[in-house]
């Protein structure tokens, strides 16, 4: 009954003011368009919320990004890794690299956004939650429709998932190299270990490749990986890793 009411089209009866004169008749098509747009928008939002709620409990089997990548590279075997089976230093490293205030914000890091706007920089300020929304539900690339959907999905994810669930899903769908998706595949392919066995150095190097997984080598130290290792230690001390 609920689903039937959800998808039932809006009533299109003639407005009560149809007999009020030619002015009311002239606005009738616009009013009908607005009614249909509102009906579609509310149903789309409800479906998005249902999908987010499902993935709060069910692990996403694949993503559009993985499907697209499979056309150019073989996809390494992916085994889902629960958050408790990922080394704490790996969790801290990816947060230090991608979103140091992950435990403190509600999906959008407004302080970082203000810094970007004030500096006039073209760099992004996407949080891990925003990246999870993009990686799980949407597609890669820059476009206003995708950004709009990401902006809707992000607070839904924050409302319906725990911080640990967000990080777990992110680490299981993130790309760490050509055809290598998820922390389980990355730990196995690059270091021959399980995610629980990753060292601080390995975790920092894996986190360092995330902005450009097709061109960066997690077997090579870099200034970025050293900075991430320091950042992971810092957020462990100052409490910004408490939710992990």
Q: Model-found features: residue ranges?
A:
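Juxtamembrane regions of bacterial inner-membrane/periplasmic proteins
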Residues: 2-244
